[in-house]
């Protein structure tokens, strides 16, 4: 499932939702370039007010689901060069889908020229495999967060991201 929203003040001016099928190549390849996304069913709700129409281009869309796979695309969070910039902490174990899981929370512990993430990783205790990743772009420095997601905007437009969050779930398939 994919959802993306944009607000102007307290009103939603754009809501995009879709049920998507993600076609993944084997994880041993560690390459997201050949993964594909197909929209099974979708809808988009746009504000009809002319003043709500923005010529803003953001990082996003259904294809983003391929790139936020932290296992297949470790550059996002699990790259050995990036790990020292995070503080990791073991949380209390939880049950997900009737299976025990380790929970590892992480948050930035360094100030870099770009925004980092914070969140939780869920690891199946028996299989020692990822089952879920919940993470969000740190808004500690809104300018860095804006640079991370904003691709194009009209001159003079003030743009302030409120939240950029991801939930990635992993299911075992034969």
Residue ranges and their predicted role:
Residues 1-85, 97-100, 150, 154-174:
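Surface-exposed, low-complexity/disordered segments
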Residues 75-77, 89-91, 101-174:
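Gly/Pro-enriched, hydrophobic low-complexity segments
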């Amino acid at each position: 499932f994919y959802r993306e929203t944009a607000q102007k003040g307290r009103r939603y001016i754009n809501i995009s939702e879709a049920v998507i099928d993600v076609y993944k190549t084997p994880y041993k390849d560690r390459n997201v370039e050949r993964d594909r996304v197909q929209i099974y069913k979708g809808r988009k709700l746009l504000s009809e007010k002319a003043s709500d129409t923005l010529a803003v281009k953001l990082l996003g869309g259904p294809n983003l689901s391929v790139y936020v796979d932290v296992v297949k695309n470790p550059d996002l969070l699990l790259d050995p060069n990036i790990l020292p910039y995070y503080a990791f902490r073991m949380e209390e174990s939880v049950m997900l889908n009737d299976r025990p899981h380790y929970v590892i929370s992480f948050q930035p512990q360094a100030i870099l020229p770009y925004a980092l993430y914070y969140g939780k990783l869920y690891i199946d205790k028996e299989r020692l495999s990822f089952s879920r990743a919940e993470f969000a772009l740190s808004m500690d420095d809104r300018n860095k967060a804006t640079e991370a997601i904003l691709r194009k905007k009209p001159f003079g437009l003030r743009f302030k991201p409120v939240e950029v969050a991801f939930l990635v779930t992993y299911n075992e398939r034969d």
